[in-house]
UniProtKB/Swiss-Prot annotation:
ATP binds at residues 22-29. Its EC number is 2.7.1.170. The gene is anmK. This is Anhydro-N-acetylmuramic acid kinase. SUPFAM superfamilies: Actin-like ATPase domain (SSF53067).
Length: 378
């Protein structure tokens, strides 16, 4: 690829790339979009690359303390940057665009620690290497500036959701990644948003353990089981984080295989079959979302869903039942559900270059709006 060169003038119709690998660790998503003031983003290319098995295993391991983890984290960050660079190459080839046409890449990295209450969040990333490999300016490290201002550093996508999905009525946007998070859109008010609890992170973990498959396709395995009401209430009652008021955020630091195993071990009912646990976890995700929405925005009229979980028809059916509102993918509003989060990081890169604050205090609890990100020139 050709280097992108020196400073650019802020002009309408700039091209940005957004890259995202989420808590579920199923792969890296990339999107090439044209962003122009007053216009809907124009998607020029998309790419979804699977996460190499060895890298996925190492990233999972790095969510917990272990031997020589600083060295291992540095190597994993470099390997991840090479996956991202492959995604960039695929996008440019698909769109038949040179690297010089792209203003910047916005890349999230891979969260391995998120402890805003201790003043830090850590995303494994090698943005300098990504800039070197692609020849394109890279904007990264979007969360730490908000955390430095006393915020949660998450979720980051509500201002993008507000720009894309605002309606004349109260609406919610639900991102179903590894963790579920809600954006609440009320006409005439800044967006609010917060994490509601686990989504794919527990569903995928349990499915992989018992079926060998990376995820429960359309909730088919869950459909063979029965929701265990007593186990569901045990899961809901046994986690203090769920009762915390917003702003709040979470991740694999809390909701992981160890969390689930501990709850199953402390459950005093009959041992449930694996498929019954899967059905119960699916209902658990839907209930935590519904309970959070009812507490924070009971006048919400409809819910748009994005993220990997938007493809799970079984989970969407559970959500519709628990939410008692219309639930549909963001595709219905013109933005493909699979690419919303990657698009958000392209949008956040643009906001950084324009020095537009993208941190929303009503979402994160920060002391004020902040410009998010750091620049790594090509």
């Amino acid at each position: 690829m050709t280097r992108s060169g020196g400073p650019r003038v802020s002009t309408p119709g700039r091209l940005f790339i957004g890259l995202m690998s989420g808590t579920s660790l199923d792969g890296a998503d990339g999107v090439l979009v044209r962003l122009a003031a007053g216009q809907a983003p124009q998607v020029l290319a998309t790419a979804g690359l699977p996460m190499p098995d060895a890298l996925r295993a190492e990233l999972l391991a790095l969510n917990r303390s272990g031997a020589d983890e600083l060295h291992r984290a540095a190597l994993a960050a470099q390997a991840l940057a090479r996956v991202y660079a492959d995604a960039v190459q695929a996008l440019l080839q698909q769109a038949r665009q040179p690297a010089t046409a792209v203003t910047a890449i916005g890349v999230h990295g891979q969260t391995v620690r998120h402890r805003p209450e201790l003043g830090y969040t850590l995303q494994l990333n090698a943005p300098a290497l990504l800039a070197e490999l692609t020849g394109i300016d890279v904007v990264a490290d979007f969360r730490s500036r908000d955390v430095a201002a006393g915020g949660q550093g998450a979720p980051l996508v509500p201002p993008f959701h507000a720009a894309m999905f605002a309606a004349p009525h109260e609406r919610a946007v639900l991102n179903l990644g590894g963790i579920a998070n809600l954006t609440l859109l009320v006409p005439g008010q800044p967006p609010r948003g917060f994490d509601t609890g686990p989504a794919n992170v527990l569903l995928d973990t349990w499915c992989r353990r018992h079926t060998g498959q990376p995820y429960d396709d359309n909730g088919r395995w869950a459909a063979t089981g029965q929701v265990q009401a007593a186990l569901l209430e045990h899961l809901l009652a046994d986690e203090p984080w769920l009762a915390l008021p917003p702003p709040k955020s979470t991740g694999r630091d809390l909701f992981d295989a160890a969390w689930l195993d501990q709850r199953l071990q402390s459950y005093d009912g009959p041992a449930p079959a694996p498929q019954d646990v899967q059905a119960t976890l699916q209902r658990f995700t839907a209930r935590t979302v519904a309970d959070a929405l009812e507490a924070a925005a009971p006048a919400t009229r409809d819910v748009l869903v994005c993220g990997g979980g938007a493809r799970n028809q079984g989970l969407k059916a559970e959500l519709a039942m628990c939410l008692q509102r219309p639930v549909q993918a963001t595709d219905a509003a013109g933005v493909p559900a699979q690419w919303v989060e990657a698009m958000a990081f392209a949008w956040l890169a643009q906001a950084f270059l324009d020095r537009t604050p993208a941190g929303v205090p009503q979402v994160t609890g920060a002391r004020g709006p902040r410009v998010l990100g750091a620049l790594y020139p090509a």
